[in-house]
From Swiss-Prot:
There is a cross-link at K258 (Glycyl lysine isopeptide (Lys-Gly) (interchain with G-Cter in SUMO2)). This is Aurora kinase A. The gene is AURKA. It is an enzyme of class 2 (transferase). The modification Phosphoserine is found at S41, S51, S342. It comes from Sus scrofa (Pig). Residues 1-125 are annotated as: Disordered.
């Protein structure tokens, strides 16, 4: 790899999980370490996060674990949410953490400043490396790399390690997309958003340290069951609407909501797992065409300006697919799908309840300004009548594991 390309990827500064990452939950479950495959290896099956295709292919999920019991208990710390980037460093050792600075009198304290400077320099040196992790079984495979079950050696913290090959990222020209995904996802703190604890890289690969979602992908569940019932659909839509509301409050537009990008936590709660097409939208509207065609709104496929209302459209498409088993505008060709989306042409099967029809019809409006707000979605009568807490469907979700 020439030096120019290496620097292009190395633009990702090495960072590490914050305090609620790999050091909190000791897990004694043991699994044998495996060797990572080469860039051309066909091992593993699906990759967890990168949005690398506009096709409706099962390319972004984690496989389910064989045990019905979750192997970790990741507690979200929503209070740590920040509106901008904040560097994170590897947790200090117990000895270092116990050394608290002594109170100093007002004014300059040369000794304290020197100690603080030394501490900062030491912190910068503590960077993650592959040797810090025990690598377990593959969880998935994708276009740019693989995802593995992993354990941080010191804390025994279970996580998912996403391995992306630099040569493949460069060849596809998506280095900037990866940087954007990391920048956005690493600063989001919400129970329905998969945590990105940190990242690091070596000469050939980029590694993302991710929260592990034991119950796998929503897409896999949907394939297995064909469609979801009203309660499960309304619950997922509620959780997703809450997560999107949080994203929008941080001026983040997701733009690629679909079953392949949604995972299930240990309690069966939904988690957005892929921010490859997401963007910060401080003030401007976007005109880039991205995401999956079945879920794209008219304003995006027509190349018009768009804003956070694109996520409301995707929410309507998702609600329809959960209840029916396929997207509302699905057709044999891209051209036909494009045409149906532009004209908002879709029909409901007889078994779709009236309340759900009303919500979906409100969300799938050609004019973005006519779509409801996320608050109105959460207050919709069909949602409030059918949605239930995530903890109440934990047993239902775990009982369906193979």
């Amino acid at each position: 790899m020439d030096k120019c390309k290496e620097n292009c990827i190395s633009g990702l500064k090495t960072t590490v999980p914050p305090g609620d990452g790999p050091k909190r939950v000791p897990v004694t479950q043991h699994f044998p370490a495996q060797h990572l495959p080469s860039a051309n290896s066909g091992q593993a099956q699906r990759v967890l996060c990168p949005s690398n295709s506009s096709q409706r292919l099962p390319s972004h999920t984690q496989k389910l674990v064989s045990s019905h019991k979750p192997v970790q208990n990741l507690k979200q710390k929503q209070s740590q949410a920040t509106s901008g980037p904040r560097p994170v460093s590897r947790p200090l050792s117990n000895t270092q953490q116990s050394e608290q600075p002594q109170p100093a009198a007002p004014g300059n304290n040369p000794e304290k400043e020197a100690a603080s400077k030394q501490k900062n320099e030491e912190s910068k040196k503590r960077q993650w490396a592959l040797e810090d992790f025990e690598i377990g079984r593959p969880l998935g495979k994708g276009k740019f790399g693989n995802v593995y079950l992993a354990r941080e050696k010191q804390s025994k913290f279970i996580l998912a390690l996403k391995v992306l090959f630099k040569t493949q990222l460069e060849k596809a020209g998506v280095e900037h997309q990866l940087r954007r995904e990391v920048e956005i996802q690493s600063h989001l703190r919400h129970p329905n958003i998969l945590r990105l604890y940190g990242y690091f890289h070596d000469a050939t690969r980029v590694y993302l340290i991710l929260e592990y979602a034991p119950l796998g992908a929503v897409y896999r569940e949907l394939q297995k069951l064909s469609k979801f019932d009203e309660q499960r659909t309304a619950t997922y839509i509620t959780e997703l609407a809450n997560a999107l509301s949080y994203c929008h409050s941080k001026r983040v537009i997701h733009r690629d909501i679909k079953p392949e990008n949604l995972l299930l936590g240990s309690a069966g709660e939904l988690k957005i797992a892929d921010f490859g097409w997401s963007v910060h939208a401080p003030s401007s509207r976007r005109t880039t065409l991205c995401g999956t065609l079945d879920y794209l709104p008219p304003e995006m496929i027509e190349g018009r300006m768009h804003d956070e209302k694109v996520d409301l459209w995707s929410l309507g498409v998702l609600c329809y697919e959960f209840l029916v088993g396929k997207p509302p505008f699905e057709a044999n060709t891209y051209q036909e799908t494009y045409k149906r989306i532009s004209r908002v042409e879709f029909t409901f099967p007889d078994f779709v309840p009236e309340g759900a029809r009303d919500l979906i019809s409100r969300l799938l409006k050609h004019n973005p300004s006519h779509r409801p707000t996320l608050k109105e979605v959460l207050e919709h009568p069909w949602i409030t009548a059918n949605s239930k807490p995530a903890s109440s469907h934990k047993k239902e979700s775990t009982s369906k594991q193979p």
